[in-house]
């Protein structure tokens, strides 16, 4: 018996990654706009964006937003699966950690560690929230 609903996992993972990408772009534009001006060279722009990866404000904002999208992804995985909400939300969290390990790179170590330790609990919390929204006789 398969406990993880693959369709629910893939859809919720795609939504979570799309929201993460969009949010990352918005955060980058917001934070970079403070240091990049109209007549900035491409090298200066690249340096400003690389400096963002070391900026505490940017990184904390990215962690908060990523945690929100992970909660949303866990909620969505659990709702779409229609059964075993914690198991399906947890599978999403583990997939998120695996992707995070694969994509980690230029950010500080503390950022990666906090992100990895927050991902699974955030996804499980999303699964918990989905349980609250389902009537007991469903």
Describe each PLM feature range.
Residues 1-138:
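Juxtamembrane/disordered regions of integral membrane proteins
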